[in-house]
Amino acid sequence: MRKIGLAWQIFIGLILGIIVGAIFYGNPKVAAYLQPIGDIFLRLIKMIVIPIVISSLVVGVASVGDLKKLGKLGGKTIIYFEIITTIAIVVGLLAANIFQPGAGVNMKSLEKTDIQSYVDTTNEVQHHSMVETFVNIVPKNIFESLSTGDMLPIIFFSVMFGLGVAAIGEKGKPVLQFFQGTAEAMFYVTNQIMKFAPFGVFALIGVTVSKFGVESLIPLSKLVIVVYATMLFFIFAVLGGVAKLFGINIFHIIKILKDELILAYSTASSETVLPRIMDKMEKFGCPKAITSFVIPTGYSFNLDGSTLYQALAAIFIAQLYGIDMSVSQQISLLLVLMVTSKGIAGVPGVSFVVLLATLGTVGIPVEGLAFIAGIDRILDMARTAVNVIGNSLAAIIMSKWEGQYNEEKGKQYLAELQQSA
């Protein structure tokens, strides 16, 4: 009997979760029984992310051993991220202006959701300027950064440590072997944890559907449709077009990442697939030094789906209140989002926090966010999938840009996937 692939297992878990959540809609016992299962799965993933990032980066950087080369890669990566996320903001603004998802919506028919936790988080984040964000990339205590899961300081430390290992030559070989062994062991652990993924997805989706009110979705159905349609357009037209410029087929990337996309979509967490997409991009021909740097950094600076949604949601709320935003106001919104959407990936409910920090500066009532908070989970699932594709593509593009992409390895990996399909 043929073994069912992971993508199908996760998909079955997703469907069963929807069915169970729908049958027991409004029953608090669903959350009581299933939430712990979902939480355990998410905690297992979070447990392995930092060890994988550190070990992979140290090994990758030590193999390069050149600060000038790494600086060049870092500069190119940030430029690419800024260009793509700016395009995402423009696409979100255009979609909101063309399709007018907030026009004609009766605010009295909408349910308000408590967003106080997001407000509190925003107040904490807003104390940090863009300059402080860059200053905080350098950790004053690496163990503090490790305990809080602050990814940018961890990446910075790992790069510096990898350069140090390379600089001491023969003396550094035992250290390098230790981190190589750690990386391999952690990828093995990842594969074992992924066997639990269908159960984690079943539990998380079951809880979401059991709590989610259809009555809150109907008045906002146009927003949901516009968001999903725009996300699909961004994947196939924008990312697909960029991929083609570099000789990459976007459908090949989607085929490679099918397991990860279903998992990221179901859990609304791109962190759940970080170790797997690093591993797969390496198998697809990207060098470890580039995948281990570009993909984790992208989680802070290249959230394409999130930035697109933030632009679209901002205009939606303006339309909801009957505010007609001028071109100059929308350009101001674009410029503000270019800054506020960067460097706070570790913050819970990052898209909401960015919107809370942004709306007031361009004259849009922040209270409007309470109307869309109830359906945020459904929208979050879509933007998470886009984030995963965007960061995976970034690793391939940077590998090609640096002239380090292994075409033969990539073709061989694709052929292996087609044979096993």
Curated annotation (Swiss-Prot):
It is a multi-pass membrane protein. Keywords: Cell membrane, Membrane, Symport, Transmembrane, Transmembrane helix, Transport. Its main location: membrane. It is found in: Cell membrane. Disulfide bonds: none annotated. Residues 1-3, 65-77, 170-198, 244, 328-330, 373-421 are cytoplasmic. The keyword Nucleotide-binding does not apply. The keyword Transport applies. SUPFAM superfamilies: Proton glutamate symport protein. One of its GO terms (molecular function) is symporter activity. GO terms for biological process: dicarboxylic acid transport. The chain crosses the membrane at residues 4-24, 44-64, 78-98, 149-169, 199-219, 223-243, 245-265, 307-327, 331-351, 352-372. Residues 25-43, 99-148, 220-222, 266-306 are extracellular. Belongs to the dicarboxylate/amino acid:cation symporter (DAACS) (TC 2.A.23) family. This carrier protein is part of the Na(+)-dependent, binding-protein-independent glutamate-aspartate transport system. Homotrimer. NCBIfam families: PRK11283.1. This is Proton/sodium-glutamate symport protein. It comes from Bacillus caldotenax. The gene is gltT.
